[in-house]
């Protein structure tokens, strides 16, 4: 015969409720862990992108020929993979940039720097 607790439930009922709660928490932890590992794998894949021109691990832009290169390789105005002339690139945020304009601005800043 089973004993009764102060709140009127038998110990079997309390043990069943505890078992169900433990199983539910375990399932929630597994789902949380799988979700976290999936997100980590996706972001790691994006972080480990290397330039197709020089091999540097840098912030990459996408050229019109769909090759991913660093900004230094893109500013040469020619794709280092397929050797197509490139006039613009797609930034990581999806916006488009004119490579000629970026080159012009960088040259202007470089020319205005005083000699040490």
From Swiss-Prot:
The chain crosses the membrane at residues 13-33. It is a single-pass membrane protein. GO terms for cellular component: host cell membrane; membrane. Keywords: Host membrane, Membrane, Transmembrane, Transmembrane helix. It is found in: Host membrane. This is Putative membrane protein. It comes from Alethinophid 1 reptarenavirus (isolate AlRrV1/Boa/USA/BC/2009) (Golden Gate virus).
